[in-house]
Swiss-Prot record:
Record's protein name: DNA-binding protein Pars_1791
Gene Ontology molecular functions: DNA binding
Entry similarity comment: Belongs to the PDCD5 family.
Pfam families (UniProt xref): dsDNA_bind
Gene3D superfamilies: PDCD5-like
UniProt keyword Cell cycle present: no
InterPro entries cross-referenced by the UniProt entry: DNA_bind_arc, PDCD5-like, PDCD5-like_sf
Keyword Transport in record: no
Keywords, sorted A to Z: DNA-binding
One Gene Ontology cellular component annotation held by this UniProt entry: cytosol
Amino acid sequence: MAEGEIEDRELEELRRKKLEELQKKAELERQAQIAAAQRRMALKRILTPEALARLDNIRIVRPELAEALEQQIIALASSGRVKVPIDDNTLKKILEAVYSQTRKEYKFRL
């Protein structure tokens, strides 16, 4: 077998693997976008416009906190533990609870 044929096969195999990786990545991104759209639709049904605006503002500043807050809101609403629609004041109370759970505490030793 010629050396060029081996290199061509190896190159083709690398291309095929790279294409598979890109396709998997694109599929994962598509699934993430679908999940985000479904969460957004659920939040629009659960939250008042003022509360939704507050959540959007939180998302700009602290995306990880907003994600935890979204999960908590959806869980509370689906279990019936909170009255829907959730107004801004109720959202603030939920935010306090979630923030206290997710807040990182830093300790410094001297």
